[in-house]
Protein backbone atom coordinates (compact mmCIF):
# COMPACT_ATOMS: atom_id res chain seq x y z
CA UNK A 1 0.00 0.00 0.00
CA UNK A 2 1.70 3.17 -1.19
CA UNK A 3 2.49 6.31 0.79
CA UNK A 4 2.40 4.53 4.15
CA UNK A 5 5.16 6.43 5.90
CA UNK A 6 5.80 9.09 8.54
CA UNK A 7 4.22 11.76 6.33
CA UNK A 8 0.92 9.85 6.37
CA UNK A 9 0.89 10.10 10.18
CA UNK A 10 1.19 13.86 10.27
CA UNK A 11 -1.64 16.06 11.47
CA UNK A 12 -2.39 17.55 8.06
CA UNK A 13 -2.52 14.08 6.46
CA UNK A 14 -4.98 12.65 8.97
CA UNK A 15 -7.37 15.56 9.39
CA UNK A 16 -9.18 18.37 7.61
CA UNK A 17 -8.49 21.04 10.21
CA UNK A 18 -11.38 23.23 9.09
CA UNK A 19 -13.65 20.96 11.14
CA UNK A 20 -12.38 21.77 14.64
CA UNK A 21 -12.04 24.83 16.84
CA UNK A 22 -8.58 23.53 17.74
CA UNK A 23 -7.29 24.25 14.24
CA UNK A 24 -4.86 27.07 15.23
CA UNK A 25 -3.13 24.76 17.71
CA UNK A 26 -3.14 21.63 15.56
CA UNK A 27 -1.64 23.59 12.67
CA UNK A 28 1.50 24.01 14.76
CA UNK A 29 1.94 20.28 15.39
CA UNK A 30 3.78 17.79 13.23
CA UNK A 31 1.91 14.83 14.72
CA UNK A 32 -1.52 15.22 16.33
CA UNK A 33 -0.62 13.53 19.61
CA UNK A 34 1.58 16.54 20.36
CA UNK A 35 -1.55 18.47 21.36
CA UNK A 36 -2.68 16.02 24.05
CA UNK A 37 -0.86 17.75 26.91
CA UNK A 38 -2.30 21.11 25.90
CA UNK A 39 -5.97 20.19 25.53
CA UNK A 40 -7.15 21.69 28.86
CA UNK A 41 -5.44 25.02 28.13
CA UNK A 42 -6.69 25.00 24.53
CA UNK A 43 -10.27 24.53 25.69
CA UNK A 44 -10.04 27.40 28.17
CA UNK A 45 -8.52 29.70 25.58
CA UNK A 46 -11.16 28.86 22.98
CA UNK A 47 -13.98 29.06 25.51
CA UNK A 48 -13.09 32.60 26.48
CA UNK A 49 -13.69 33.68 22.86
CA UNK A 50 -16.97 31.88 22.17
CA UNK A 51 -19.93 34.17 21.36
CA UNK A 52 -22.45 34.40 24.19
CA UNK A 53 -25.36 34.43 21.75
CA UNK A 54 -24.40 30.92 20.62
CA UNK A 55 -22.95 29.36 23.78
CA UNK A 56 -24.09 29.08 27.37
CA UNK A 57 -21.52 29.17 30.15
CA UNK A 58 -23.23 27.12 32.89
CA UNK A 59 -20.15 26.64 35.06
CA UNK A 60 -16.51 27.62 35.21
CA UNK A 61 -14.62 26.41 32.14
CA UNK A 62 -17.69 24.76 30.61
CA UNK A 63 -19.26 26.05 27.40
CA UNK A 64 -22.28 24.39 25.80
CA UNK A 65 -23.79 25.52 22.52
CA UNK A 66 -27.37 26.70 22.86
CA UNK A 67 -28.31 24.42 19.96
CA UNK A 68 -26.76 21.36 21.63
CA UNK A 69 -28.87 18.81 23.51
CA UNK A 70 -27.49 17.56 26.82
CA UNK A 71 -29.60 14.94 28.61
CA UNK A 72 -30.32 15.66 32.29
CA UNK A 73 -28.56 12.46 33.35
CA UNK A 74 -25.37 13.27 31.42
CA UNK A 75 -22.34 14.67 33.27
CA UNK A 76 -20.13 17.37 31.80
CA UNK A 77 -16.96 18.15 33.73
CA UNK A 78 -14.58 21.07 33.23
CA UNK A 79 -12.93 22.08 31.09
CA UNK A 80 -15.22 21.22 28.21
CA UNK A 81 -16.78 22.64 25.08
CA UNK A 82 -19.88 21.07 23.53
CA UNK A 83 -20.39 22.26 19.96
CA UNK A 84 -23.44 23.34 18.04
CA UNK A 85 -26.16 20.77 17.28
CA UNK A 86 -24.31 18.10 19.24
CA UNK A 87 -26.26 15.49 21.19
CA UNK A 88 -25.01 14.30 24.58
CA UNK A 89 -27.28 11.42 25.53
CA UNK A 90 -28.44 9.97 28.84
CA UNK A 91 -25.69 8.53 30.99
CA UNK A 92 -22.82 10.08 29.06
CA UNK A 93 -19.79 10.89 31.25
CA UNK A 94 -17.60 13.73 30.05
CA UNK A 95 -14.88 13.72 32.68
CA UNK A 96 -13.26 16.91 31.48
CA UNK A 97 -10.70 18.22 29.01
CA UNK A 98 -13.05 17.34 26.15
CA UNK A 99 -13.43 19.52 23.08
CA UNK A 100 -16.51 18.20 21.27
CA UNK A 101 -17.22 19.67 17.85
CA UNK A 102 -20.42 20.50 16.02
CA UNK A 103 -22.95 17.83 15.08
CA UNK A 104 -21.42 15.12 17.26
CA UNK A 105 -23.11 12.30 19.16
CA UNK A 106 -21.88 11.30 22.63
CA UNK A 107 -24.00 8.40 23.72
CA UNK A 108 -25.17 6.35 26.66
CA UNK A 109 -22.34 5.22 28.96
CA UNK A 110 -19.74 6.85 26.74
CA UNK A 111 -16.83 8.38 28.65
CA UNK A 112 -14.63 11.17 27.30
CA UNK A 113 -11.37 12.31 28.87
CA UNK A 114 -8.68 14.60 27.47
CA UNK A 115 -9.76 14.34 23.86
CA UNK A 116 -10.75 16.28 20.77
CA UNK A 117 -13.73 15.22 18.69
CA UNK A 118 -13.88 16.88 15.29
CA UNK A 119 -17.25 17.92 13.87
CA UNK A 120 -19.61 15.08 13.04
CA UNK A 121 -17.86 12.49 15.20
CA UNK A 122 -20.07 9.77 16.69
CA UNK A 123 -19.28 7.80 19.85
CA UNK A 124 -22.86 6.73 20.49
CA UNK A 125 -22.85 3.56 22.60
CA UNK A 126 -20.62 2.43 25.49
CA UNK A 127 -17.40 3.94 24.22
CA UNK A 128 -14.31 5.09 26.10
CA UNK A 129 -12.25 7.81 24.46
CA UNK A 130 -9.21 8.96 26.42
CA UNK A 131 -6.13 10.93 25.39
CA UNK A 132 -7.23 10.76 21.78
CA UNK A 133 -8.15 12.82 18.72
CA UNK A 134 -11.07 11.67 16.56
CA UNK A 135 -11.31 13.16 13.08
CA UNK A 136 -14.18 14.57 11.05
CA UNK A 137 -17.16 12.22 10.81
CA UNK A 138 -15.25 9.36 12.39
CA UNK A 139 -17.38 6.75 14.12
CA UNK A 140 -16.87 4.17 16.85
CA UNK A 141 -19.31 1.27 17.00
CA UNK A 142 -20.95 0.08 20.20
CA UNK A 143 -18.45 -0.94 22.85
CA UNK A 144 -15.38 0.16 20.89
CA UNK A 145 -12.78 1.78 23.14
CA UNK A 146 -9.41 3.44 23.19
CA UNK A 147 -6.93 1.91 25.63
CA UNK A 148 -4.69 4.77 26.69
CA UNK A 149 -2.08 3.22 29.04
CA UNK A 150 0.20 0.25 28.39
CA UNK A 151 0.12 -2.56 30.92
CA UNK A 152 3.74 -1.91 31.88
CA UNK A 153 3.14 1.87 32.02
CA UNK A 154 6.02 2.52 29.62
CA UNK A 155 5.95 5.42 27.12
CA UNK A 156 3.99 4.77 23.94
CA UNK A 157 5.84 4.26 20.66
CA UNK A 158 4.00 4.52 17.33
CA UNK A 159 4.79 1.60 15.01
CA UNK A 160 3.29 0.09 11.85
CA UNK A 161 0.28 -2.08 12.63
CA UNK A 162 0.75 -5.84 12.80
CA UNK A 163 0.38 -7.38 9.38
CA UNK A 164 1.80 -4.44 7.44
CA UNK A 165 5.32 -3.05 7.18
CA UNK A 166 5.18 0.71 6.97
CA UNK A 167 8.06 2.70 5.57
CA UNK A 168 9.01 4.38 8.85
CA UNK A 169 10.94 3.66 12.00
CA UNK A 170 9.13 3.52 15.37
CA UNK A 171 8.26 7.01 16.63
CA UNK A 172 8.72 7.60 20.38
CA UNK A 173 5.98 9.87 21.71
CA UNK A 174 7.28 10.34 25.25
CA UNK A 175 3.73 9.88 26.50
CA UNK A 176 2.56 7.27 28.99
CA UNK A 177 -1.07 8.15 28.22
CA UNK A 178 -1.97 8.01 24.55
CA UNK A 179 -5.13 6.42 23.18
CA UNK A 180 -5.75 6.68 19.45
CA UNK A 181 -5.81 9.05 16.51
CA UNK A 182 -8.70 8.41 14.10
CA UNK A 183 -8.43 10.05 10.70
CA UNK A 184 -11.39 11.67 9.00
CA UNK A 185 -14.21 9.24 8.14
CA UNK A 186 -12.55 6.35 9.99
CA UNK A 187 -14.94 3.59 11.06
CA UNK A 188 -14.24 1.38 14.08
CA UNK A 189 -16.40 -1.72 14.46
CA UNK A 190 -18.26 -2.80 17.58
CA UNK A 191 -16.29 -4.03 20.60
CA UNK A 192 -12.93 -3.25 19.06
CA UNK A 193 -9.96 -2.17 21.17
CA UNK A 194 -7.61 0.51 19.92
CA UNK A 195 -4.45 -0.16 21.91
CA UNK A 196 -2.19 2.69 23.11
CA UNK A 197 -0.64 4.57 20.21
CA UNK A 198 -3.04 3.34 17.52
CA UNK A 199 -3.36 5.49 14.40
CA UNK A 200 -6.26 4.76 12.02
CA UNK A 201 -5.91 6.49 8.68
CA UNK A 202 -8.69 8.45 6.95
CA UNK A 203 -11.44 6.39 5.29
CA UNK A 204 -10.18 3.19 6.94
CA UNK A 205 -12.52 0.53 8.33
CA UNK A 206 -11.70 -1.53 11.41
CA UNK A 207 -13.78 -4.71 11.57
CA UNK A 208 -15.75 -5.55 14.75
CA UNK A 209 -13.94 -7.36 17.58
CA UNK A 210 -10.56 -6.19 16.34
CA UNK A 211 -7.56 -5.52 18.55
CA UNK A 212 -5.60 -2.80 16.79
CA UNK A 213 -2.04 -1.90 17.71
CA UNK A 214 0.05 0.54 15.70
CA UNK A 215 -0.57 2.63 12.60
CA UNK A 216 -3.10 1.48 9.99
CA UNK A 217 -2.85 3.29 6.63
CA UNK A 218 -5.56 5.36 4.97
CA UNK A 219 -8.18 3.69 2.81
CA UNK A 220 -7.64 0.23 4.27
CA UNK A 221 -9.62 -2.50 5.98
CA UNK A 222 -8.25 -3.94 9.24
CA UNK A 223 -9.37 -7.43 10.23
CA UNK A 224 -8.50 -9.46 13.30
CA UNK A 225 -8.39 -13.24 13.21
CA UNK A 226 -5.63 -15.68 13.88
CA UNK A 227 -3.43 -12.75 12.99
CA UNK A 228 -4.14 -9.21 11.88
CA UNK A 229 -4.63 -8.48 8.22
CA UNK A 230 -4.73 -5.25 6.27
CA UNK A 231 -6.12 -5.25 2.75
CA UNK A 232 -6.88 -2.55 0.22
CA UNK A 233 -10.49 -1.57 -0.34
CA UNK A 234 -10.27 -2.21 -4.08
Please report, for each region that a protein language model flagged, where it lies by residue.
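Terminal amphipathic alpha-helical/low-complexity segments used for targeting or macromolecular assembly
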Residues: 1-61, 169-170, 203, 209, ...
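N-proximal short alpha-helices
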Residues: 8-9, 55-59, 77, 88, ...
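Glycine-rich hexapeptide-repeat left-handed beta-helix
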Residues: 23, 117, 124-234
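Short, solvent-exposed linear motifs at loop/edge-of-secondary-structure regions
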Residues: 30-34, 117-119, 184
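A generic local structural motif
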Residues: 56, 62, 74, 92, ...
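Short secondary-structure boundary segments
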Residues: 72-106, 148-149, 156-168, 172, ...
